Amino acid sequence: KGSMLTKMPGDLWQKFANLRLLYAYMWAHPGKKLLFMGQEWAPWREWGEGRELDWWLLQHAPHKGMQGLVRELNRLHRSLPALHARDCEPEGFRWIDADDAERSVFSWLRFRAKDDAPVAVATNFTPVARPGYRIGLPKAGRWQVLLDTSATRYGGSGPDTPATVTAESRPLH
């Protein structure tokens, strides 16, 4: 038992970073999404029927940032059919790299239809920044960065990721 935040390992900064990562991972992975009774702003206490939610936590930047992240995850989920249209079909998901255990970075693609542009997801499960980390995107050119859980607006330490990245036309994975 306990709130999602208290289940996260590490110090205060790591707890919030890990929870942001968990929520982004959950929203980007196939399957239906569920948060319960205030978990979108990372309360310290678990919900209880005998008291109100800890709304006052939204006065504090880390909790307000978490709420903003969940708002953005919901917006992306609604606006990008690749993130929800084929939740129950294997064709809606393809790993780019599930084997980088040394750096704890995993990447995958989500698809709405075979010929549609996919949504690429890269997750870093460590507190170590990975500048210049390369993943094998399926098409060369500019890709828009839609979300970075370490962005300062979500309570992360930044630096904020550039708005676009460029994929080169050379095999990687």
Each language-model region and where it sits:
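Carbohydrate-interacting/catalytic domains
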Residues: 11-20, 25-35, 39-173
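Active-site clefts of carbohydrate-active enzymes
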Residues: 1-11
